[in-house]
Amino acid sequence: MIITDIEKIDNMAEQMCGNNPNLIAIDMNDYNRLKSSSSYLNATQIQMQCFLSEGIEQLKQAIKEFKTEGAHQVLLQICGVSSALEVHEIRFKEMCMILKVVEEHFEKNQVAEKLVLHVTSALDKDFCKNVDIVWGLSHRKSTEIIGREVNVIVGYK
């Protein structure tokens, strides 16, 4: 389900960027930069037990709901959720599968000739000519949900 309410998206960004021990960080600076350079935002949060075929299919269906026209940047956070203190594993292969789903959606719809993947704080306004995917990996503790979570915020011009 696509979230369009800016207050809900702000809350989601605070959860994404809050006090979580991030492995590769998306922080509030990234979100605020996206928010200030966008006329509007859309977001979604997908919770799943694993990134096997059913989880990836769930992600594909959720991503299809995003319109691509006018999209200029995507914040993507892949989060392991567990009740234990240790980080719930997110394997490199799983991370790549998720990035591929997001990339293919925007590429297939010809929003940009190419997508640029980079880690946060490498953002530069002159550099961002196409749709950028800014991504991060993190972990959070929860007593309710154990598994994995994918958070997506898309900024539109």
Residues covered by each model-derived region:
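Tubulin/FtsZ superfamily GTPase core signature
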Residues: 1-157
